[in-house]
Amino acid sequence: IIGPNGAGKSLFLRLCHGLLKPSVGSVRWLGAGTTNDLVSAQAMVFQRPVMLRRSVAANVDYALKLRGRTKTDRKEIINEVLGRCGLRRLQEQPARVLSYGEQQKLALARAWALNPEVLFLDEPTASLDPASTHAVEEIVKAIREAGTRIILTTHDLGQARRLGDEILFLHRGRLLERAETDKFFEAPENDLARAFVRGELLWWQLGRDNRRHEAQDKDPNNQ
C-alpha cells in the first residue's frame, strides 16, 4: 500500500486488522467478517515496535503464552524464529537495549512466532538505515515464503517493487488504483498515481489547483 502522507494508509491497516471499526460498511477477510477468530489469525508490526521490559526471548514467549502454546512448544518456536531473524545470540539481552533495527527484527520474530494467516506491517523500515532495512526486508520475504500473507504500507517505492505482488495506491482516504506491481510501476492508469511514481505529486496537485482557480476566475458567474 503506497501513497503520500495523509493518504490513510495506516488507518486502512488498522481497519483491516480490527483495531478500529469502520463507521460505514464492513471489513471482510476471505469472505468472512472480522470475528475474534479472524483477529487471532492476524498479527501486526508497527513503525515503532513496542517492547516489553523483558529479555528478547521473553518478548516472544509472552506472545505465545497469550495464544495458549505449551512450554515445550514455546521453547522450540522461540529458538526457531530468533534464529531465522538473526537474534538467537541476543535472546537473553533486555529487549529495550537493542538497537532500533534489532527491535524491529524482534517485533517481526514475535509476530512470525504466532504463525498468522495475515501479517500487517505499517512502514516497518521507515526509520531504519539501509543495512537494517535490507535485513528486515529479508525477514519479510522469509515470512511470506513460509505461507503468510503480508499487507505492508511504505513510502519507499523501491521497497514496494521489491516486496509487493500487488500495489494499492491511496490518496486522501480513497483507493485510486490497484494493480499488479510490474503493471503499476510501468504504466499507472490514474493521473495521481502516475505523478506519485514519478515524484511529481506535489507539483501535479499545485498545477491542478491553479487550473481550477483560473477557471473560476474566468467564470462570469463568479464575477
Residue spans for each PLM region:
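Conserved ABC ATPase signature
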Residues: P94-L98, E102
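Catalytic Walker B motif of ABC-type/P-loop ATPase nucleotide-binding domains
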Residues: L119-D122
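Helix N-cap at the start of a conserved alpha-helix in ABC-type nucleotide-binding domains
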Residues: P130-S132
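Helix-to-loop junction immediately C-terminal to a conserved catalytic motif
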Residues: H17
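H-loop/switch region of ABC-family ATPase nucleotide-binding domains
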Residues: T154-H155
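A short, surface-exposed alpha-helical micro-motif characterized by mixed small hydrophobic
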Residues: A160-R162
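Conserved ABC ATPase "signature" region
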Residues: T72-L90
